[in-house]
Amino acid sequence: CLACGVNYMDTANYEPENTDDPEWRAIYEKRCKEAGFSAYFDYSWQWAYAKKFEEAGLTALLGSGFDPGVTQAYCAYAKKHEFDTIDTIDILDCNGGDHGYAFATNFNPEINLREVSAPGSYWENGHWVEIPAMSIKREYNFDQVGDKDMYLLHHEEIESLAKNIPEAKRIRFFMTFGQ
């Protein structure tokens, strides 16, 4: 987009196609040590372009789907208009459909499977806490959908919320799945 002089928009953050690429691997391993989470996807690659886009007079809108996207907009609105401070953010993503299959997803199943098989993580007291995949389970009653099991996962909006709502002591993301 920079080379063509056009604005950029995506619905989720960067995830490399080749995780064995030595250049990407070196940056990834450094980030794992410094940040404390091991997800293959994160915003660091895209945030590194911020100054270049600004200097070019271009806009790059990252994570403009629902989660990430709408979830951050709701949190920003709540911070600006509803609360003096935000202590805890829990995002509860519920897929109420089943598509007639045991495993229901409302987006790319390959990405969904990578999310559920990767270690989970959340932001607490200024640092990342990483946990084994799907090791934190909660049940929640979703209006019009009913009781659903949900699992704590790593999800990219936690990164941007931790950066933009630094007073939050804990930020977590939970997702439901078909049983």
Please name every model-derived segment:
Residues 2-107:
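Glycine-/Pro-rich loop/turn segments that contact NAD(P) or position catalytic residues
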Residues 81-179:
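C-terminal catalytic/substrate-binding lobe primarily of soluble NAD(P)-dependent oxidoreductases
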